[in-house]
Amino acid sequence: MSAGTAKTPLSNSFFSASLADVDPELSRAVQQELGRQQHEIELIASENIVSRAVLEAQGSVLTNKYAEGYPGRRYYGGCEFVDIAENLAIERAKRLFGCDFANVQPNSGSQANQAVFMATMQPGDTFLGLDLAAGGHLTHGAPPNVSGKWFKPVSYTVRREDQRIDMEQVAKLAEEHKPKVIIAGGSGYPRHWDFAKFREIADSVGAVFFVDMAHFAGLVAGGVHPSPFPHAHVVTTTTHKTLRGPRGGMVLTNDEALAKKINSAVFPGLQGGPLMHVIAGKAVAFGEALSPDFKIYAKQVVENAKALADTIISGGFDITTGGTDNHLMLVDMRPKNLTGKAAEAALSRAGITCNKNGVPFDPQKPTVTSGIRLGTPAATSRGFGVAEFKKVGELIVTVLDGLARAGEAGDGAAEKKVLEEVHALTDRFPIYA
């Protein structure tokens, strides 16, 4: 065989061998994770289950393509087809949220937030955000985060008596500190936000009003949650969670001048080449979210959350704010003298996945907490309705009551029985079968 026709050692299998053939160890971990998702009830509020179409787009050959820049203005050749993917994502995002500009390149919600900070502030500038301990997010000024290191965060909180946003405090802090930016949004607040009032306060001090709707974007898209537009100057979101797309971020605005600053902040300010396979997955998910079926899904997410909250309250637990308007709730363990850490572990043993979470004015350490956070997006995606979520609420109460009786090791018999019922439920609503 001549040198010109010689084959490399990889050529026979490199493009055809499966993951199981090439890397059995990793393949086994993937299959185990698939089994976990299939047979456990996922109640982590920030997680969801994507369609097979999203998985296919994200696992496509678009992962091979470098595409620094923006559609039609790339720094590499050969981008004509990935431009189609990104333009589809942009146009669908704009339709979905009724805005004029969308940047779909951020690799995460955190990077989307960083881009907004870069576009609207200088290091050392002051901004207002919800305290992490009251349901805010790390990127809204927590001391370990870059937002707390490079800028001067001032935190507003919730009222002790009803755990709702203290808008009088927001107005007072804005007047006192004259922030450049005011943020609405968080990771543990179960009620609607008064976007109009926030904008009024922002206008009174000349601040940019920034909404981080990472948790409830899918509910906005589905028409069951108030939209931050037209009140917000700029909006960020993740593309997973309630929006049910691949893990990633996005920035939206109606302000052309601000959009240009955001584009520059994303690239070249924070990122180089965007992840085109993920952007393709975003395009697919946004297309799905434009369908009538998604509106039905979003409505069901909220109805399921209310049913779950009501059932848990009936079981003797407190829900922060007394209920929920969206997809999530914080369950206060203190009426049963439990910690969030112990509750998370007990529920995990029973096949129910959630996360420990602080509650407002929590006396426990962040690594222990007095609460757990529950959400309905993932189990709703697999087909659970109100009846199933009432049952899930009853199962949660059974496990936690057993924990209260037996101590930190939990009630093994109760947990085993609940695990069997969890498997019966998940078998009725299979995923990726």
Curated annotation (Swiss-Prot):
Catalytic activity: (6R)-5,10-methylene-5,6,7,8-tetrahydrofolate + glycine + H2O = (6S)-5,6,7,8-tetrahydrofolate + L-serine
PROSITE patterns given in the database record: SHMT
A molecular-function term among this protein's GO annotations: glycine hydroxymethyltransferase activity
Keyword NAD: no
Chief location bin: cytoplasm
Record key words, sorted: Amino-acid biosynthesis, Cytoplasm, One-carbon metabolism, Pyridoxal phosphate, Transferase
Name of the protein this chain belongs to: Serine hydroxymethyltransferase
